[in-house]
Amino acid sequence: MARFKHVARKLRLAAALKSNRAIPIWVSAKTRLRVRRGFSLRNWRRSKLKNI
């Protein structure tokens, strides 16, 4: 990827980076382990982002 990135592309990459994290501990505690992990986790090698 080029070094110079447009601001819109940089914002989309930052949003994807922030959303790619595990769920907080209090969520699994509040739901009594019905929600164990986030299903939207993405690995940089396995699946690529679209429209960026």
Curated annotation (Swiss-Prot):
SS bond partners: none
One BP annotation, GO: translation
Gene Ontology, cellular component aspect: ribonucleoprotein complex; ribosome
Protein's UniProt keywords contain Lipid biosynthesis: no
Keywords tagged on the record: Ribonucleoprotein, Ribosomal protein
GO MF term list: structural constituent of ribosome
Source organism, top-level taxon: Archaea
Family recorded in the similarity comment: Belongs to the eukaryotic ribosomal protein eL39 family.
Protein name (Swiss-Prot/TrEMBL): Large ribosomal subunit protein eL39
Taxonomic source organism: Desulfurococcus amylolyticus (strain DSM 18924 / JCM 16383 / VKM B-2413 / 1221n)
Gene that this polypeptide is encoded by: rpl39e
